[in-house]
Amino acid sequence: MSTNQIILTDQGDNYVNVWSHVAQDLYNHYGETLYNSWFSKVNFIESSLNTVILCAPTNFVRDWIKSKYSMVILQLFQHYNNTIKSIEIITKELPGTTQTVTELPTKTFADIGSSELNSENIFSTLDARFTFDNFVVGAPNELAYAAARAVAESSGAVSESNPLFLYGGVGLGKTHLMHAIGWYIKQHNPSRKVIYMSAEKFMYQFVKALRNKEVISFKEKFRSVDVLMIDDIQFICGKDSTQEEFFHTFNTLIDNNRQMVISCDRSPSDLDNIEDRIKSRLGWGLVADVHSTTYELRLGILESKIEQMNVKIPKDVIDFLASKIVSNVRELEGALNKVIAHSNFTLKEITLENTQNILRDLLRSNERIITVEDIQKKVASRYNIKLSDMSSSRRLREVARPRQIAMYLSKALTPKSLADIGKKFGKKDHTTVMHAIKKVEELLENDIELREEINLLMKILQN
């Protein structure tokens, strides 16, 4: 049992106190703006039969919290009281004690003392929305997902993927997988000490420890864990002192068979302004990339989110979002949330026309939209072949492979059907395009160099 968990068995004032802790955690995690928008007017009403009852000020706030934050709130309550099994959010207050938490002090890094530096609690740094159960798996992320799952399920032993290095563009799921690892371990192996934090926060805590002469405490905190997860490691590029400390922390953990998980926006070999000895170590274990989403994966993500939020969205709207919002998962989910929120606020039906109007600014940025012709030109230039080779029937490998890659990218980055794509490649039929896509997907499973090449092409085309 975690030493910082508060176990309460009675009701009344104790639960009011727990709600105060939960509210503080929500404030710390989501920030002042979001907290004031959704949580500041929520009241604790009572607890009954292991259920906590909260009161929201309006039906809309109630429904929004239920759809997006109910699991977060439940897990926070369970952190302080493991007898709580569910929460209920109502809009009509019941008789009894109520507690509203409205103004909470912001806790800055400067306020963190040595006792907090040594805290084993990672709960407040994990987002309960990010679990393995709600991670949608597809060809672009299946290796990263399988590796993350293996790390989480290693039951105290170090996985073969040590360190596990996840890399890819913004909003593609790297952070989701790291949070999922943390949640899984805390739920199934609560005795294991886990730390998750960004590389930026790692640096700030190191600087703070130097300033306050608490370096020993800092080293003990990070070198005594069972699992250390550092997000966005590219942040330490060019920061020599932080790199030095990270290097020794890395060595200590690996030498003691402790697991490390690291994320980055590029592969270890592409990192600049970082020591070669660190770059080499980052590639010791499994390097798994999370590349840009396909139409099918975007469709699956949308359907999963819609099911979680228990809303009804017309099929043509879902298809439109999956076809048009191609940059990353974060932007895709944000677009869906914006459409739903607009409908709730205005009480207007969700239609394709309304969706196009609501998202017109976002669509404009995505509509630098990549055409099949753009892809053909870029791939032909990249592989030094003639543009006319894209529509030819030449079977030479140096021509056929770039053509297959261009077909794969056309499916991933445009809303065109297989038949339409085939027409752009010398009037080839849809089965030829399907074969090309399948061939590239098979190659991507084992060819790291090809994955990096396609990721680079996607970034060039999208930017």
UniProtKB/Swiss-Prot annotation:
The membrane spanning regions, by residue number, are none
Where are the annotated segments for Domain III, AAA+ region? 125-343
| Swiss-Prot/TrEMBL keywords | ATP-binding, Cytoplasm, DNA replication, DNA-binding, Lipid-binding, Nucleotide-binding
Keyword ATP-binding annotated: yes
CDD domains, sorted = AAA, Bac_DnaA_C
Instruction: Name the cystine pairs.
Output: none
Compartments reported by the entry: Cytoplasm
Q: Where is this region: Domain II?
A: 83-124
Q: Where is this region: Domain IV, binds dsDNA?
A: 344-463
Q: SUPFAM superfamilies, alphabetically?
A: P-loop containing nucleoside triphosphate hydrolases, TrpR-like
Instruction: From the UniProt entry, list the residue stretches annotated as the region Domain I, interacts with DnaA modulators.
Output: 1-83
* GO cellular component, as recorded: cytoplasm; plasma membrane
The residues listed in the UniProt record as binding ATP, with positions renumbered to this chain, are: G171, G173, K174, T175
Chief location: cytoplasm
Which GO terms of type biological process are on file?
A: DNA replication initiation; regulation of DNA replication
> Could you give a GO molecular-function term held by this entry?
ATP hydrolysis activity
InterPro entries noted in UniProt: AAA+_ATPase, Chromosome_initiator_DnaA, Chromosome_initiator_DnaA-like, Chromosome_initiator_DnaA_CS, DnaA_C, DnaA_dom, DnaA_N_dom, DnaA_N_sf
Q: How does it assemble?
A: Oligomerizes as a right-handed, spiral filament on DNA at oriC.
Q: Its family?
A: Belongs to the DnaA family.
Q: What does this protein do?
A: Plays an essential role in the initiation and regulation of chromosomal replication. ATP-DnaA binds to the origin of replication (oriC) to initiate formation of the DNA replication initiation complex once per cell cycle. Binds the DnaA box (a 9 base pair repeat at the origin) and separates the double-stranded (ds)DNA. Forms a right-handed helical filament on oriC DNA; dsDNA binds to the exterior of the filament while single-stranded (ss)DNA is stabiized in the filament's interior.
- Domains (record comment): Domain I is involved in oligomerization and binding regulators, domain II is flexibile and of varying length in different bacteria, domain III forms the AAA+ region, while domain IV binds dsDNA.
What name has this protein been given in UniProt?
Answer: Chromosomal replication initiator protein DnaA
User: Which species is this UniProt entry from?
Assistant: Rickettsia peacockii (strain Rustic)
Taxonomically, what lineage is the organism?
Answer: Bacteria, Pseudomonadati, Pseudomonadota, Alphaproteobacteria, Rickettsiales
